[in-house]
């Protein structure tokens, strides 16, 4: 079969991409405004204000509906290439989020973020190593679960798997477990945050620390407050998220070193090689956008340029989150069972609750910007 050229590959993307963009258009233009005006339990806008059913969560739910009901559990071939752009949309949105910050603002909250994230990332990994040994779990399973729960879910688990000889089934179980837990927290966290009257700063710090998957952190922050601007939940949550993502190569090295200690014939890799191969390149784009903002090259706060960028960000994230929902396979989550499920749920719940306690005890309501 003759390999397709660039034009052919681009055309393959169009059908699935049109589905995602069209879905978001309908949700933002018709469904969300209707829900804001709908009267439930005698209260106008109850669905949005109490359940946080804005276009962000609706995008994910619609994507899940496509995958698990409309498509019968598998994205069809005609739409597959379009839906594969999901990660590109989300990472592009993360890069654009850099426009919400300046370096002086990052320095004001960076110390708190680094302290909390490093403590939780490595603390979670160590806890899972201990829990896995107590429950008699395979070391490869324990290692991938430690990465998945400790850092940011799928990316960290995939990055760790080769160095700890994880089998495909080990990786699949780890990913399914943390995604399943993340889906639950993604929907309940906005409700908890509003019930506890958390500020955007507190909510962003909690979610950025306690939720396991990067995409779910963004979705949860936007469900709590869908506004893209400095001082909002997504602005604070993404600082925590970026710090956590930067930790990936260091955690991969830490976990693989633990694995080697118990496996005499395991393959040794240096920290330098792991840094070179695992460092998340999109973080550099985020930093670059922050540099442009710091130099006032994107315009002053409230400018037309920034207003346009934030509107574009909303669309980029919305399209990406429709795709994110379409990659949540309920059958795979149900298949995650036994010891891996117990490890993931215990560790995830401990991290989630402990993060909330620490945020309530030590993080003030007012952020640095």
UniProtKB/Swiss-Prot annotation:
Disulphide-bonded residues: none
One Gene Ontology term, aspect cellular component: plasma membrane
Principal cellular location given in the protein's record: membrane
Localisation: Cell membrane
Keyword Membrane: yes
Topology in membrane: Multi-pass membrane protein
Coiled coil: none
Pfam families: Cons_hypoth698
Superkingdom of the source species: Bacteria
Keyword Transmembrane helix (UniProt): yes
Keyword line: Cell membrane, Membrane, Transmembrane, Transmembrane helix
TM stretches of this protein: 13-31, 46-65, 110-132, 142-164, 171-193, 240-262, 269-291, 306-328, 341-363
Family statement: Belongs to the UPF0324 family.
UniProt name for this protein: UPF0324 membrane protein DVU_0543
Native source species: Nitratidesulfovibrio vulgaris (strain ATCC 29579 / DSM 644 / CCUG 34227 / NCIMB 8303 / VKM B-1760 / Hildenborough)
Organism classification: Bacteria, Pseudomonadati, Thermodesulfobacteriota, Desulfovibrionia, Desulfovibrionales
